[in-house]
Regions:
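Catalytic His-Asp segment of secreted/periplasmic serine-dependent ester chemistry enzymes
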Residues: 157-267
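A generic structural signal for well-ordered alpha-helical segments
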Residues: 74, 143, 189-190
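C-terminal, surface-exposed recognition/capping segments
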Residues: 1-44
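Cell-envelope and extracellular/periplasmic
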Residues: 84-89, 114-119, 123-124, 155, ...
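Conserved, well-ordered alpha-helix/loop/beta-strand core segments that scaffold catalytic motifs
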Residues: 110-115, 133-140, 144-153
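Glycine-rich anion/phosphate-binding loops
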Residues: 89-96, 126-136
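Serine-esterase "nucleophile elbow" of acetyl-processing enzymes
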Residues: 42-109
Length: 267
């Protein structure tokens, strides 16, 4: 897979379409579902933030249940973050609602984090890491074209899927390494495009590339974070969003994000 630093030209936004019979991935890099140009509809839309939230978080169940499981119940309201997660969704399904959940809300920053449900084959089909990466890249380019700052969250660690059978998990014993490889692509892409990469994975993983037991919602889950896991993620997320928006009041947290000291020319 060859990564480039080219950005999407013009205002091309994903629109909801049928998951059946969608176009192949070579019709538009990273598409995987039908796109149409809505240039005529968006020329009248003002650029920049109006009254939107500081950040919209788009993702899967890890995003959806965050507010209910964190011990910091005012984390999202205090930081003006709007979570838009839907349990069980793949990156393809998440990208299909990018317009309604992100663009319509007009945030200053978009945080994109997904991938585990693709690798868990929630749609019943084998999935390559390149396909997941392509969907995430499309969302990132769409957000950047709209004028949003972009944060790409790593896929959190997982080396087994509790809702799949033991036979399935045995046949997918390389899951943890596949998550690592997906995150490598995401990090490299974020570096090339000047986006911020929020590295949840490194902070949450055990020595088997699974979710650390103390950060797992239950001992048998090992996919969804506990309150302690979300506390770690909150530090990483806030620092990432602050850096993406060049907040002069940003302070270091205990989490990790990519290459903070290399940024120059802040205004």
């Amino acid at each position: 897979l060859v990564l480039t630093s080219s950005s999407a030209s013009g205002n091309y936004y994903p629109v909801q379409g049928s998951l059946g019979g969608y176009s192949s991935y070579n019709s538009y890099t990273g598409a995987g579902y039908q796109l149409r140009c809505v240039r005529e509809q968006t020329t009248a839309m003002p650029k920049g933030r109006l009254e939107g939230p500081r950040a919209v978080l788009i993702g899967n169940s890890i995003t959806e249940v965050w507010q209910g499981r964190t011990d910091n119940k005012t984390f999202f309201s205090d930081n003006d973050y709007l979570p838009k997660g839907i349990s069980g969704q793949t990156s393809l399904q998440i990208s299909a609602r990018f317009y309604n959940d992100v663009i319509v809300n007009d945030p200053a920053c978009v945080v994109i984090a997904c991938g585990v449900n693709d690798l868990a084959e929630n749609d019943g089909q084998p999935c390559s890491i390149e396909r997941v990466f392509a969907d995430i890249r499309l969302m990132a380019e769409t957000g950047a074209a709209r004028g949003f700052k972009v944060v790409i969250g790593s896929t959190p660690p997982a080396n087994r899927i509790w809702w799949q059978s033991e036979e399935w998990n045995a046949a997918h014993a390389d899951l943890g390494q596949r998550v690592v490889e997906l995150n490598r692509l995401l990090k490299q892409y974020a570096e090339e495009r000047g986006f911020v990469y929020a590295d949840y994975h490194s902070a949450l993983k055990d020595d088997q590339n699974g979710l650390k037991l103390e950060y797992s919602w239950t001992p048998d889950d090992r996919v969804h974070p506990s309150a302690a896991g979300y506390a770690v993620m909150e530090k990483i997320l806030k620092k990432a969003v602050d850096k993406a928006l060049f907040d002069p009041n940003a302070t270091d947290g205990d989490g990790q994000i990519d290459d903070l000291d290399k940024w120059e020319g802040w205004e």
